[in-house]
Regions:
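N-terminal helix-turn-helix DNA-binding core of bacterial DNA-binding proteins
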Residues: 21, 25-67
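Alpha-helical structural segments
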Residues: 18, 22, 48-49, 61, ...
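C-terminal regulatory/oligomerization modules of transcriptional regulators
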Residues: 1-5, 126-143
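Charged, amphipathic alpha-helical coiled-coil/dimerization segments
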Residues: 24, 74-134
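Conserved amphipathic alpha-helical interaction elements at protein-protein interfaces in regulatory
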Residues: 29, 33, 49, 78, ...
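N-terminal leader segment of winged-helix/HTH proteins
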Residues: 1-34
């Protein structure tokens, strides 16, 4: 039986995985100082930037499940970075809001994330970085 021709090191999946691991490691080093995980950072950034106000909305942005999101939100709330408040429109619904401490922390983390992004793209021109992002978004949409 003839072996199929496939070079792992030339596949997109291989490189996406290696890049993801390296980015995650870089961010985890920065997040370790704050005793946060990358998923907790994702929640904070989405509450800060995307006008997300409920745990259900967070599911769209974090690729988590309800149980894990609840646990992550509980931890962030216990650390004082966010709070649950009753929705003025629907008394059954709880809204998530960053506390003042959560806003300050998230802004510090955004600065750290920008540094990591700069490190990642240090060998690319501005045009290459823009093109790469556009191509990655195109791939993401098609999946």
């Amino acid at each position: 039986m003839e072996k199929q021709n496939f070079e792992l090191q030339k596949s997109l999946g291989y490189h996406f995985n290696i890049i993801f691991i390296n980015i995650k490691k870089s961010m985890e080093i920065k997040l370790k100082d704050y005793n946060l995980t990358h998923l907790q950072f994702s929640i904070l950034i989405n509450l800060y930037k995307n006008n997300v106000t409920t745990q259900k909305e967070l599911l769209k942005y974090t690729y988590g499940d309800e149980t894990s999101i609840t646990r992550l939100v509980d931890r962030l709330e216990s650390k004082g970075y966010l709070k649950r408040v009753q929705s003025p429109e629907d008394k059954r619904k709880k809204m998530l809001l960053l506390t003042e401490e959560g806003v300050v922390l998230t802004e510090e983390l955004i600065t750290s994330a920008k540094k990591v992004n700069s490190e990642i793209t240090a060998n690319l021109s501005k045009e290459e970085s823009t093109l790469l992002l556009e191509l990655l978004q195109k791939i993401d949409i098609s999946m």
